[in-house]
Amino acid sequence: MAAPAAPAAGETGPDARLEAALADVPELARLLEIDPYLKPFAADFQRRYKKFSQVLHDIGENEGGIDKFSRGYESFGIHRCSDGGIYCKEWAPGAEGVFLTGEFSGWNPFSHPYKKLEYGKWELYIPPKQNKSPLIPHGSKLKVVITSKSGEILYRISPWAKYVVRENNNVNYDWIHWAPEDPYKFKHSRPKKPRSLRIYESHVGISSHEGKIASYKHFTSNVLPRIKDLGYNCIQLMAIMEHAYYASFGYQITSFFAASSRYGTPEELKELVDTAHSMGIVVLLDVVHSHASKNSEDGLNMFDGTDSCYFHSGPRGTHDLWDSRLFIYSSWEVLRFLLSNIRWWLEEYCFDGFRFDGVTSMLYHHHGMGQGFSGDYNEYFGLQVDEDALIYLMLANHLAHTLYPDSITIAEDVSGMPALCSPTSQGGGGFDYRLAMAIPDKWIQLLKEFKDEDWNMGNIVYTLTNRRYLEKCVAYAESHDQALVGDKTLAFWLMDAEMYTNMSVLAPFTPVIDRGIQLHKMIRLITHGLGGEGYLNFMGNEFGHPEWLDFPRKGNNESYHYARRQFNLTDDDLLRYKFLNNFDRDMNRLEERCGWLSAPQAYVSEKHEANKTITFERAGLLFIFNFHPSKSYTDYRVGTATPGKFKIVLDSDAAEYGGHQRLDHNTNYFAEAFEHNGRPYSLLVYIPSRVALILQNVDLQN
């Protein structure tokens, strides 16, 4: 038989392309070992990694490295010099002229012109007064004046402004020069990265039970101790980056370097973060780099008089669904701006990482609109992927983890893009975690569409365990999304209007309240135990907060009634909210002791449709759930991997959790060498209806 013909010169087959990709991406072989289905897309990972490496190389060649490049906030904006002068710098490539005005100049718009530099940059030096004090004192108001090429005179806030305020009933924000003589000094070191991440998703403004905007100081004094007591070791702060529209929930950013002044001063936010650190709690910022507000007078939009500057020009620069502007991630100065923003929050405020909002919108040119992701790998590669945005995310993760190796980054991505949470050295996105966004949808679907006796145990387990191998997920039963007006929290789906009338401990349990309290605990525990490598709860949901969240707006007559968290409900000893709060606390504290979130994925030994039971093992614990609305089971056999004596360590039916006390916690359960459900040992337990148990092998513990 004749030998096969050699390939023509320059021709490359699939094997040759794979070899080339493996040669270019340092740890791609490991990624393809983890997920062999990615092999046909090796060239995509090669291209992404080479582009990422090229940008890093170019930054090194032209800027002296990413360390220097990400310090844009040290020169852009306005800064006090050692001689008492003021140095100002802006990037406004479309401007005809740039000027600084403010209280210091009597608002003369043209008295202080900037000098034009290369690449669209402008700078200004303002000498000090004769006594060497700065001409622009701390707390004074400023504006950048732009003269456009069409002759317009535009008043703007610097994109690098550190503090902006809106006074009285003004429509727009004022830029305030923030340079206090005695800035806050951090007293406590950053906690180490938790081995298990238990996140308390928080919004400072709604953290009071009163109908008003709460302050950083209120949150520090009143909410941080609650979070610590509940056993959470991480806070995710929403709506910190300044946003002109309060009802946007912080997702229409106008000033990216300014901490929202609604809640207080920058120094008070620093005190909040520092106090959390003193409690051993890490703090994540909900960072919004997926889009920006359309505001121009107090936002980035049209900063230099053009529709481009920081954003794509034309239709590509607008998000049709969000009505906001979209960054041009391939722009050198946009990269400087966004990477410097990452560094600013890490260094100036000592945040410990980020939850990146709207990642799906960034990753794809279609922004996820009208797309149903089926899991077909072809959906994650090709022309629909915005590789410039993906490269930016790789750079942002690289920067955060280079500066602070214990930094935590979480991606909000509904698409399930493969390798998003793999290291950049593998060609991945570099995130530490992704949000398990299908889980809350599953719980809402079950509560809306199915009777309890029709819940599919296998489908619940599938949803909770359906995650990419070695890509960590943050599981949650509900987040702020489910609390917003128009939706319902789990507690409200379960108990609805009876929450207003039948939550008193002095009244007998109604069937609705009984069902609601028992299922609320079970849903949260099985999500916590089976759903991921991290867990998230939105503030107030731990105790079954009874109302949705609705910020003041025209549609509700600017009311703050629903823009609050009624922590007073769980503090009232005569109300049943305390039971849910107690369970959430003890669930977190048990995880802290046993570490199931940092343990390998659970082994599910039973998902019995007729009995409505689910059992699994994780971190040496035996989790047992009976979702049946009416059937209890005596001497129910449960499989386990180990012999020995087991004890109950968490029981949702306990009195302190609003249960019916049907289990004796002094009972010992002995696992014998009796194979069951694929496990070599098994034990017999009593599992009442609508009860969740965790058993621990005390022999192994000892």
From Swiss-Prot:
Q: Which residues carry this modification: N-acetylalanine?
A: 2
For this chain, one GO molecular function annotation is:
1,4-alpha-glucan branching enzyme activity
Q: Where does substrate bind?
A: 62-63, 91-93, 118-121, 333-336
Modification Phosphotyrosine, positions = 173
Superkingdom in the source lineage? Eukaryota
Reaction(s) this enzyme catalyzes, per UniProt: Transfers a segment of a (1->4)-alpha-D-glucan chain to a primary hydroxy group in a similar glucan chain
Q: Which residues form the active site?
A: 357 (nucleophile), 412 (proton donor)
Q: What is its EC number?
A: 2.4.1.18
Location of site Transition state stabilizer? 481
Family note: Belongs to the glycosyl hydrolase 13 family. GlgB subfamily.
**What protein am I looking at?**
1,4-alpha-glucan-branching enzyme
Q: Which organism is it from?
A: Mus musculus
